[in-house]
């Protein structure tokens, strides 16, 4: 199953610069329908009103971390099937394992580029058409 370039994507990060970088990388891949949120709580609020094809979230945010957002998404019957990629500087093995156990679909350690992001997305959705 290939990913749909028109699917809405939610980028969650507390740094506007990182949101812009991820938006630009997604645009390089061909995605235009990208929303953003500054933390997990704001992301959950947006997810209540719109069905996203993918959530890309940072791990370290306040007041709600990306890890906590992932756990909330997976616990929600309405949201639990939403694909989720964690993008973070947290490369510690225990964090990767915790995210996998919580149900993350893929995990990217910063820094990264468009090719890395696309490869990780293809691993979640299958190769692009």
Predicted features, each with a name:
Residues 112-121:
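C-terminal output helix
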Residues 45, 67-80:
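Short amphipathic alpha-helix used as the core "switch/output" element in two-component signaling
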Residues 23, 68, 91-106:
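Alpha4 helix (beta4-alpha4-beta5 surface) of REC/receiver domains from two-component response regulators
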